A protein has these predicted regions:
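Active-site loop/turn elements of alpha/beta-hydrolase fold enzymes
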Residues: 1, 44, 51
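Short glycine/proline- and charge-enriched loop/turn segments
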Residues: 52-62
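C-terminal helical subdomain
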Residues: 41-42, 61-103, 107
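Conserved sequence/active-site signature of Rossmann-fold short-chain dehydrogenase/reductase
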Residues: 33, 47-48, 52, 97-99
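Intrinsically disordered, low-complexity acidic/proline-/asparagine-rich linker or regulatory tail/stalk regions
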Residues: 108-114
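Catalytic loop of short-chain dehydrogenase/reductase
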Residues: 1-20, 26, 30-33
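Conserved SDR Rossmann-fold cofactor-binding beta-strand/turn motif
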Residues: 38-48
Length: 114
């Protein structure tokens, strides 16, 4: 989850941008809550999309099946949008139960020379 942790899979620019988006979302809520404007930072872990094919060691089909799916993210966005006006979901983390970063598999996707 690049918006929460620094890691080698996503790279410097992507991770920095994700951190900035979280700060922007918090700033929107801070500056505009009195106007009824709200923002939610949706922070997904690994989502099974084609972008994973660009990794040096793409995850297997079995690993992808265990990841958050595009439909899961869509359902979460709908949930956020359907909240009543008096509710602000500031930040939501959505990760798979079988989380590769917890079990160390994500670290194996980065080739290391050490």
């Amino acid at each position: 989850m690049a918006s929460q942790r620094v890691g080698g899979v996503s790279g410097i620019a992507y991770t920095s941008a994700k951190h900035a988006l979280n700060a922007m979302s918090e700033s929107i809520n801070h500056e505009n809550c009195h106007l009824g404007i709200r923002a939610c930072a949706l922070c997904p872990g690994e989502v099974a999309t084609e972008i994973l094919d660009l990794r040096p060691a793409p995850p297997s089909a079995e690993e992808r099946a265990r990841m958050v799916q595009e439909e899961d993210v869509g359902a979460t966005i709908l949930f956020i949008a359907q909240m009543p006006p008096h509710v602000c979901l500031n930040e939501i983390h959505i990760t798979p139960t079988w989380n590769r970063s917890y079990i160390g598999a994500a670290d194996r996707t980065i080739p290391r020379d050490d």
